[in-house]
Regions:
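Helix N-cap/capping motif at the beta->alpha junctions
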Residues: 22, 44-53, 76
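Conserved acidic segment of CheY-like receiver
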Residues: 13-35, 65
Length: 166
């Protein structure tokens, strides 16, 4: 089993994560795993509407959002568009079980796209000014969660101090 590097736990403790996914079982598994890894606060939302409201009403603004793409009511792409309009500065990771085969749902924003959906979603979100670091295909495992957190923590780490030459 993959374990995070010991320095990572201090960095994980600074994360305030918003998980947005319509799969309640996955939300619970991710919440337990994040808590086990030392993440300080975890907010859950079952669809894009809940995610947007949770983000807007949070006492401590999430600094990491992990968002599914295909959800009922308000999907991930629409959620990301609203977050961009709100000026969201959080780090964002996109997850989906529908990377190469879109779901049969004409209401889903990317239902008719013929190609890797995760790559397209990343590009669209970045064009809107969001800080998307990567996307991950489901299933989401403990190892993928550690990879996700390490990616964000490494990106946000201060640059190493440069020692002056003598």
């Amino acid at each position: 089993m993959m374990t995070p590097n010991p320095d990572a736990n201090a960095a994980y403790a600074k994360l305030h994560v918003l998980l947005v996914d319509d799969d309640e079982f996955l939300l619970e598994i991710m919440k337990v795993t994040l808590r086990d890894l030392g993440v300080s606060s975890i907010l859950l939302a079952k669809n894009g509407f809940e995610g947007l409201n949770t983000f807007r009403q949070a006492t401590i603004r999430p600094n990491l959002i992990i968002c599914d793409l295909c959800m009922p009511q308000l999907g991930g792409m629409e959620l990301l568009s609203h977050l961009a309009l709100d000026g969201c500065k959080a780090d964002i990771l996109i997850i989906s079980g529908h990377n190469l085969i879109p779901p049969v749902d004409n209401h889903w924003a990317l239902a008719n796209y013929n190609g890797p959906i995760l790559n397209l979603a990343e590009k669209i979100a970045r064009i809107q000014g969001l800080k998307v670091h990567a996307s991950f295909e489901k299933p989401i495992t403990r190892e993928k969660i550690i990879e996700m957190l390490d990616l964000v923590v490494t990106f946000n780490a201060p640059p190493p101090a440069i020692q002056a030459s003598k």
